[in-house]
UniProtKB/Swiss-Prot annotation:
Optimum pH is <7. Is active against E.coli ATCC25922 at pH 5 (MIC=12.5 uM), whereas is almost not active at pH 7 (MIC=70 uM). Coiled coil: none annotated. Expressed by the skin glands. This is Phylloseptin-S1. It comes from Phyllomedusa sauvagei. Residues 30-41 have a biased composition (Acidic residues). It is found in: Secreted; Target cell membrane. The modification Phenylalanine amide is found at residue 65. Disulfide bonds: none annotated. Residues 1-22 form the signal peptide.
Length: 66
């Protein structure tokens, strides 16, 4: 009977360890995705801030040739 208890505890322990590892990997993946989303948003903001400069540049070129 003691052998069965030890085996059962070993199986449960190994199951918990593998579950913990899977959850940690899942958390890391979610953090990487979140970081990627933040990078994409910051790139979009940088591009949007350049639009007024581009428009004014195009307008000045149009005046020069127009």
């Amino acid at each position: 009977m003691a052998f069965l208890k030890k085996s059962l505890f070993l199986v449960l322990f190994l199951g918990l360890v593998s579950l913990s590892i899977c959850e940690e990997e899942k958390r890391e993946t979610e953090e990487e995705e979140h970081d990627q989303e933040e990078d994409d948003k910051s790139e979009e903001k940088r591009f949007l801030s350049l639009i007024p400069h581009i428009v004014s540049g195009v307008a000045s070129i149009a005046k020069h040739f127009g």
